[in-house]
């Protein structure tokens, strides 16, 4: 699922349909199971799927979303104004995602700009970071100023 789609879901999802599963200071994580999500493809076909989301709140306001993709992976989106505040790390520390979704054991990252954040998340969750060596090789080729 793209960041644009996750942003749209986050804007429109009703957090009252979920349950608070974790609170850390002024942060809350709300789990919403079996949320009906409609996607329309480029050719106009409509696809309906049911997903599990973890909504991240800061001071009661939606800050981010974590999508559980079947038993394979997770996707994370945080609104730009909430980035670099360690919201995901604080709410998911101590292997919380691994406890919440024990069938998930890895995370992938294809975005060089987010690599270090995703690697940190993988480490605190006990996940394997897929394609880590490929990304590290690409980073090594970037000239330092």
Describe each model-derived feature in a short phrase.
Residues 1-36:
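A short, well-structured alpha-helix characteristic of acyl/acetyltransferase catalytic modules
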Residues 38-41, 45-48, 103:
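Acidic, low-complexity, intrinsically disordered interaction modules
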Residues 44-64:
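Conserved beta-hairpin
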Residues 63-76, 136:
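A conserved beta-turn-beta hairpin within the catalytic core of GNAT-like acetyltransferases
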Residues 73-87:
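A short, internal acetyl-CoA/4′-phosphopantetheine-binding micro-motif in the GNAT/acyltransferase core
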Residues 84-100:
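Conserved acetyl-CoA-binding loop-helix of GNAT-fold acetyltransferases
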Residues 106-123, 127-128:
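Conserved beta-strand-loop-alpha-helix junction that forms the acyl-donor binding cleft
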Residues 110-111, 126-142:
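Conserved catalytic-core motifs of GNAT/GCN5-like acyltransferases
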């Amino acid at each position: 699922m793209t960041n644009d789609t996750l942003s749209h879901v986050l804007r429109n999802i009703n957090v009252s349909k979920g349950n608070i599963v974790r609170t850390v200071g002024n942060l809350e994580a709300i789990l919403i199971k079996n949320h009906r999500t409609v996607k329309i493809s480029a050719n106009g076909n409509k696809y309906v799927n049911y997903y599990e989301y973890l909504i991240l709140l800061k001071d009661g306001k939606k800050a981010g979303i974590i999508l559980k993709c079947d038993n394979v992976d997770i996707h994370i989106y945080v609104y730009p104004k909430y980035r670099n505040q360690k919201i995901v790390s604080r709410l998911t520390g101590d292997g919380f995602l691994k406890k919440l979704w024990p069938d998930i054991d890895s995370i992938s990252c294809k975005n060089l700009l987010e690599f270090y954040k995703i690697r940190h998340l993988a480490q605190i969750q006990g996940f394997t970071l897929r394609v880590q060596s490929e990304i590290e090789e690409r980073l090594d080729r970037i000239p330092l100023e």
